[in-house]
């Protein structure tokens, strides 16, 4: 039974690897994916939520 399951999984894996469609690449229109040389603020904004709950019992 394990051999049958293994054969099925291997067949499904190989069938998934043999897709005939072209690779999907997003259109960037000459723009980079991330902002390049973006200025980083010297100080973080004042209103930031606290990621750690700090209340005491």
Swiss-Prot record:
The organism's superkingdom is given as Bacteria
Lipid addition (S-diacylglycerol cysteine) is recorded at 17
Lipid moiety-binding residues (N-palmitoyl cysteine): 17
Name where it's found: Cell membrane
Q: Where is this region: Disordered?
A: 35-57
Q: GO cellular component terms? A: plasma membrane
Q: How does it sit in the membrane?
A: Lipid-anchor
Q: In the record, which residues are listed under signal peptide?
A: 1-16
Q: What else is known?
A: Transcription of the operon is maximal in early exponential phase.
Protein name from the UniProt record: Type IV secretion system putative lipoprotein virB7
> Which species?
Brucella suis biovar 1 (strain 1330)
């Amino acid at each position: 039974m394990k051999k049958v399951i293994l054969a099925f999984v291997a067949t499904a894996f190989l069938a998934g690897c043999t897709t005939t469609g072209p690779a999907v690449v997003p259109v960037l229109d000459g723009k980079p994916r991330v902002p390049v040389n973006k200025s980083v603020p010297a100080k973080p904004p004042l209103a930031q939520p606290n990621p750690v709950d700090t209340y005491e019992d």
